[in-house]
Each structure stands twice: as C-alpha cells, then as structure tokens.
Design a protein with these regions (language model features):
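A compositional/structural signature for long, glycine/proline-rich flexible linkers
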Residues: 1-242
C-alpha cells in the first residue's frame, strides 16, 4: 500500500498517522512529533517483499502481519476551519500498490472476524491501561484531560478495578455493543471518499459518552497487504459524529 503524508504549513495543527498490525503493534507512527510533521511518501510492504520498480523514492515500511490498521487523525480549529482541514485531508494519498488485484464486494465475506477478533481478546482493564497511555498525545487538549482527570486516569497506578461499578458496567457494555455492531455489519453501509473506505455504525454507550473525537477528523481502514483487500472500519467528522 502507498501512503503519502502532506507537509503541514501550520506546525501547531495536531496530526497523527499510525499504522498498527492486527496485534496493535506499531508499524508506523508519524505526525506533529516528527520532523516536517512526518511528511513523506511511504510504501508499506508485507514482510520481505521487494520494493517494486518505480517506487525506489518511497520509504519502505514493513509489517509482519498481512492485515493492518491505517489511522489518521487531523485537528481542525472548529467549524470555520473545516474547509481548510478538509483540503489538507484531501492531500493524503492511500492506495493499493496493485489496485487491479482488488475485487470489490457488496458485503464482507461470511465468517469475517478481522476486527472482532481483537475486541474479543482485549478486556476492559486492558482498554483502560491503553487509554492511560494516550496522556502524552492529549496533553495539549484540556477537554480530554478533564475527562481523564474525572476518571482518575492521570494516575498511572490507577486501574480499571478501581473505577466506580457503574462505569465498569458502561465500559463492558460498550465493548459488547461495539463487537455486535461489527459482527452484524452487512457491508452495504460502506462508502468511499478520496480512497478512504468507511462505515457508520454504533459504538455503544461508553463510546458515545466518553470517546474523545472533538475537533479531530478521524479515519481508519484495514487493508490486507497479502491479498490486496481492504475492510471498512470507522470514520468521524470534525465534530466527533461517527
């Protein structure tokens, strides 16, 4: 897969581009913490696959897993900035290296569990631990820090078991809701915009109440480097609407 990240003129605008494998290990992380906002041309290859002819000027990134998550978060400064933020978004390029191999589907194949596998493995306690690990990325935003402060997540020693019982239940039910939404997804709700495939669905009560998306354009897709297929994941707009 090809990923081209544009250079941002505004170096204060938050940008995070992550590629994670199916075990959520980091394959690539670029953004405002990197030189030139991580701008550049990248080619994501499966294991020891050779860089194809004509792509020698691309930076090779290798993944041990065939299925990977591509996630982009781009900050906007409110409604008056949406036009500029969307124009930046349109400069991103993500496309299959061999698009002629891709066969379009009206729905996901029977037995598909690409996303649900990880959700059934990750427990709520692990979710809280990972959420605590995002503090460094959200220190610039007082809204998110306020949420985390209310949940006592700024204390690295704090654990899921110490949350009030009603919050533990909301998190657990949110996991179940999210899993069922994935398992019941027909594929017909999908759409394509500038090469990004997405779908719209419920993320559960916990996700609706506590998931931080305000003023962040959020895109995620799951391409398969081995079979040249792509599965829909999630998209939100700058107001956090899924």
């Amino acid at each position: 897969y090809i990923l081209e990240i544009p250079r941002l003129e505004d170096d204060k605008r938050y940008l995070l581009v992550n590629i994670l494998n199916l075990k959520t290990e980091m394959v690539l992380s670029k953004g405002t913490k990197n030189k030139d906002n991580g701008a550049g041309k990248y080619i994501i290859l499966y294991r020891d696959e050779k860089v194809p002819e004509g792509y020698e000027d691309y930076i090779p990134i290798r993944s041990e897993d065939s299925r990977n998550y591509f996630i982009i978060r781009l900050e906007s400064y409110g409604e008056n900035d949406y036009g500029k933020a969307n124009a930046i978004q349109d400069q991103f390029v993500m496309r299959a290296l061999y698009p002629e191999r891709i066969v379009e589907r009206e729905s996901l194949p029977d037995g598909y569990n690409g996303q649900s596998y990880f959700m059934t493995q990750m427990k709520p306690a692990e979710f809280i631990r990972r959420l605590q690990g995002t503090i460094a990325d959200t220190r610039h935003d007082e809204t998110m820090l306020t949420y985390m402060r209310q949940l006592r997540l700024l204390d690295p020693a704090f654990s899921y078991e110490e949350l009030p019982e009603h919050l533990q239940k909301e998190i657990a039910s949110g996991f179940e809701d999210g899993l069922q939404a994935i398992l019941q997804y027909s594929g017909t709700e999908g759409y394509e915009s500038n090469g990004w495939h997405a779908y719209i669905d419920s993320v559960g009560e916990y996700g609706r109440k506590y998931r931080y998306r305000a003023h962040i354009n959020y895109f995620a897709v799951m391409p398969n480097l081995y079979s040249d297929t792509i599965s829909p994941n999630l998209e939100t707009d700058s107001d956090g609407n899924v």
